[in-house]
Amino acid sequence: MKKLILHFSTLLLLPLGTAHAQQHVDLPRADGAITPSIVYEPKAVKGCAPLALLSHGAGGSEERGLRYLGEALARDGWRAIALGHRESGLPVLRKDMRAEGFHDGIAALVTDADAYKARFMDIDAALKWSEAQCHAPYKVLAGHSMGAITVMLEAGARNKLGLTTHGAFDAYVALSPEGPGIVFPTDAWQPIKAPMLLITGTKDKGLDGDWTWRSQAFDGLGSGACRWLAVLDGATHMNFGGLDLADHYKTRTTSLVTQYLDGLRSGHCPSLSAAPGLVLRSK
């Protein structure tokens, strides 16, 4: 039996009808489990495309949520892989919520060290698969909510779960990042060395606070490595997760991400531009 199973489909990704290939890929993990994934391939690129891995939030899947970001990155010339984290997907979240209620159920999942260890194996499986296709010249990890926690952990943030990683990416993008609380101590972000873009919204509420609490992750980062914080007026938690993403927020979020990453790929820290309804900070 083949260890790697590919299911190919074609999806209309652009409003004007331009088609991009989409692969459903089952990636073999180091522990023998399978990581279901969706690969968004760029239409045309010279050589090997840069790589972006996408990590969903608690209760998400490879098919729900961050599709909008995968599509945008593919249009921008990236190979984007949306990972399906089974150990922190919807069935697991429902089980925790039935046992402990809504708030405590989510808290139980986002503080489960084993769930993050499984996510790290998902990430390693995707990196191994992508490397077998070609050597990506630039690698980025992006995530939303629990996926943003995963991003911070992979980048080297201190944490209360006893987790360590090897920081295999050139840059990171955190949508709805977590501030200090049940996962991160107040000095969590100081060890992070890589460039990072953080995006939140004024209605982006979390377990331990609102957008100002989320912004503390940016405050905790050191300066000098192209760190940006973007705050979108009126944007909610679900907007960034893609489950309730109005075109207005979709356009702004994907534009920020692609502009930031394109600048880094070209060898400089981009100068993002503030606009009505968008507040930016950098260091």
Q: What does each model-found stretch correspond to?
A:
Residues L27-C134:
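Serine-hydrolase catalytic machinery in alpha/beta-hydrolase-like enzymes
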Residues T164-G234:
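The feature captures the conserved acid-bearing segment of alpha/beta-hydrolase catalytic domains
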Residues L54-G59, S145, G201-T202:
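Glycine-rich His-Gly loop
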Residues G234-A235, G241-K283:
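Alpha/beta-hydrolase-fold serine-hydrolase catalytic core, especially in secreted/extracellular enzymes
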Residues A126-P191:
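Primarily recognizes the serine-hydrolase "nucleophile elbow" in alpha/beta-hydrolase
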Residues G17-A21:
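Sec/Tat signal peptide C-region and signal peptidase I cleavage site
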Residues G59, H85-G89, G179, D204, ...:
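Alpha/beta-hydrolase active-site loop signature
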